[in-house]
Regions:
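Sec/Tat signal peptide C-region and signal peptidase I cleavage site
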Residues: 20-26
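Hydrophobic/aromatic-rich core segments of domains that either
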Residues: 122-186
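Bacterial N-terminal signal peptides that target proteins for export
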Residues: 1-10
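Extracytoplasmic/periplasmic, Sec-exported soluble proteins
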Residues: 47, 65-72, 102-113, 146
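Acidic/histidine-rich, surface-exposed loop or edge segments in extracytoplasmic proteins
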Residues: 35-67, 93-103
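Mid-length scaffold segments of soluble, non-membrane domains
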Residues: 75-133
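Glycine-rich catalytic cores of cysteine/serine-nucleophile enzymes that process amide/ester linkages
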Residues: 28-49, 147, 165-194
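Bacterial N-terminal signal peptides
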Residues: 10-19
């Protein structure tokens, strides 16, 4: 009787373990990815459930502080550009969008980059994965007469301080870590093309 009872408990325990809910899989996502300068072209980028689970892990690794979250958003942007680059043929996007290569569909200007990064950040925000920031509107600096070419960037706003931070993925090449700094510092940069 003891053996039969043990066997029954083991079988019952195994059934409970197998029927226990696993971690909820993340819903897939689809976003529009701009390229070809001025969002002239766009490619649909699809993120599978596995992709979204990986992205959540990258972003949530930064939940300990605002600084850690910005670092995690930089890593998430790199991850995003690798996937989007493969899907859109822009994985060879050069630093500063191959400045001067206006008709090259594999390159992105700062308008493409700021729209893409903002769209991506809004996806993260909509999923509820941001602890310390909200997504801001894209910002611009320069207007030629101040010796700076016009340049756009994505932004996030730190919840605790209200300070705006840029996540500028146009400066580096595809899938390299973006420039992340306070908006007030970014606004002063870019004179004569220097960053």
């Amino acid at each position: 009787m003891k053996i039969s009872m043990r066997r029954t408990l083991c079988v019952f325990g195994a059934m409970v373990a197998l029927s226990a809910p696993s971690a909820a899989a993340e819903e897939p996502a689809v976003i529009r990815y701009c390229h070809g300068f001025g969002c002239k072209l766009s490619t649909t980028v699809r993120f599978s459930s596995v992709d979204m689970t990986e992205l959540k892990s990258i972003v949530r690794a930064g939940r300990s502080s605002a600084e850690a979250e910005r670092e995690a958003l930089g890593r998430a942007d790199q991850w995003y550009e690798r996937l989007a680059g493969a899907a859109s043929g822009t994985s060879t996007d050069k630093a500063k969008g191959g400045f001067g290569e206006v008709y090259d569909a594999s390159q992105l200007d700062c308008i493409d980059e700021s729209r893409n990064t903002t769209t991506f950040l809004k996806l993260i925000e909509k999923r509820g994965w941001l602890s310390h920031h909200t997504v801001g509107k894209p910002k611009v600096r320069g207007f030629i007469l101040d010796l700076r070419y016009p340049h756009n960037t994505a932004t996030v706003i730190e919840k605790e301080t209200g300070e705006a931070w840029v996540i500028d993925s146009w400066i580096p090449a595809n899938a390299e870590f973006p420039d992340i700094m306070p908006l007030k510092i970014w606004k002063k940069k870019g004179v004569l093309g220097r960053n």
